[in-house]
Structure formats: structure tokens, C-alpha cells
Amino acid sequence: MVTIPPLVSRWFPVCGFRVCKISSPFAFTTPRWPHNDVYIGLPITLLHFPAHFQKFSQPAEISDKRYRVLLCNGHQTPALQQGTHSSRQVTPLSLRSRSSTFNK
């Protein structure tokens, strides 16, 4: 399992893309990325495009935390639906389709 401290720049394969930077004002804590080869310790539902920000529904997770994963192609990872971070499979194609809607 890969533990990533805040504000570091390293390469991690995610859904066919590579992650350039993972930034957070808070320490990473919790679950895992829903892919066999990548484990990132942060709440997956907090990953977001600015227009699609989502929070965990659990009271313990409600805060001003902001997590952002920057991909090498310049896109941020899309927000995943709440409660599906352990089973949701996001393919490179779906990431590209989602990302393209924000490039107008």
C-alpha cells in the first residue's frame, strides 16, 4: 500500500493516466483507490472537479477538507459517487469523456 504525504509530486498510474501531483492541506487517512495497482490513502469521494465537489455523508468526514489529484493531461480526477469508492471502476475512456465536458 502506498502512503502519500501532502503536497508531493510523484508518478502513480491511475486508470491509464499518470498522476502528477496530489495535494491536500490535511494528512491522508483512510480507504483505497478502487484499482488493484494503485492505493492512495484519502477519501475517494473528495476527489473532484471544481464543478462537481462532493463530500462524505458521514458526520466524521464533514469538514473543509479539499483533496485534488492532478493528472498529467491537465485534468483533475472526477468526483466519484458517494458510497461507491470500493466498487466503482473508472476506465481511461470514461475519464477522458468526463474531462472533455469541462474543456469548452
Curated annotation (Swiss-Prot):
It holds the Pfam family Circovir_ORF3. Residues 78-104 are annotated as: Disordered. InterPro entries: Circovirus_Orf3. The keyword Heme does not apply. It is found in: Host cytoplasm; Host nucleus. GO terms for cellular component: host cell cytoplasm; host cell nucleus. Keywords: Apoptosis, Host cytoplasm, Host nucleus, Host-virus interaction. Plays a role in modulating host cell signaling by binding to and degrading host RGS16. Not necessary for virus replication. Interacts with host RGS16. This is Protein ORF3. It comes from Porcine circovirus 2 (PCV2).
